[in-house]
Amino acid sequence: MKILHLFQWKLGDITACIPKVKEQGFDAIQISPIQGTKDNGDAWWLLYQPTNLKIGNSQIGAKEELISLCNAANSYGIKIICDIVLRHCAGDNWEHLKPHRNVDPELLQYLAEPTECTDYCDRWQCTHRCTGMPMFDYNNVGFQKKVTEFLDELLACGVWGFRLDQLKHYALPEEGSNFLNVLS
């Protein structure tokens, strides 16, 4: 599969160039995270500090634009892959392990203990401690339900698949986590 990664492109701009993407022989397009962000700036990293598990942000586009993109891409046989951020939320600008004030209050109950990772060569620390942002307890059943609802909504819009950001920071099933099984 030939995947074109259109990092930070607006959904409407991608939709407009679908015929050209097909002409160039691509089978899929990976889009940037479409979750809410802590402000409307254009810095790339804002997309990787989500405030919610909802579709739409000022940088990439709205849910309606995602549906239009998926419909247009589908008509050309092109799959849409959405980059998603589920391990952490946006941090406060000064206290990075504290959630930003714009983080969805419903998600705050799913935050993990705010202990910083001090050894990135220690697998347990990388999968159970914070890596510079407020981290979610991805093994919490309530959080998993929220994630599943979000992914189902993306699939209903026509998204074909996902790229999961920070995958190395999730424990595997053989390490006692069922999170990745819930996603599949």
At which residue positions do the language-model features occur?
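Short catalytic-loop micro-motif centered on adjacent basic/acidic residues
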Residues: 3-5, 162-167
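Substrate-binding/active-site clefts of carbohydrate-active enzymes
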Residues: 2-5, 9-16, 24-26, 30-157, ...
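Outer-membrane beta-barrel proteins
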Residues: 169-172
